[in-house]
């Protein structure tokens, strides 16, 4: 049997994770500032991808800069933005019940979605530090009544200096247990987020590489 191996294309564009690759506990990882600087100076196509839906790209750019990383907000793409792009394509200017922070709320407002507690078409779950029993109960009832269940990302936990933090995946599991409905997850490792990211910078999959640290999100999708 003859196996023909296709020659790999030259990598000219990059997608990179943020936490654990460029950034850890409020500081740039050694070598990351130099890499970003090199890419910017060479006008290399790249985009920072993160499943963090709490912050807007503007917020993240400021936070990264405070830790020594100069990443323009235009080169940051979050799971909240990917979720908004997905919903804008599926059902433009529709309605949603949203559990999340400023990053998700801003992204949803920017596509013209109306937030409502009256028969929303979607229940959209993002990462949040302000969960309440009331909001979870409402979400479960809307899902049981027919609202489509969307989650920004599958990560069950996130990092912090004090240990793990509960993240979107854990809350989604709770709602799934309560409703019997699994969410459609937009963020990594969903290939759709990567396709959207590549379109954003005019890149092609054959000449783009993914840099990540998590096998279950970054590496799986990169393959």
Where are these regions (language model features)?
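Asp-based phosphoryl-transfer active-site loop
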Residues: 7-29, 48-49, 222
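Substrate-recognition element of Asp-dependent hydrolases with the DxDx(T/V) motif
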Residues: 15-16, 32, 36-64, 76, ...
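A short, structured active-site edge motif that brings together acidic residues
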Residues: 73-82, 118-121, 154
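Conserved Lys-Pro-Asp/Glu-containing loop-to-beta segment of HAD-superfamily phosphomonoesterases
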Residues: 183-220
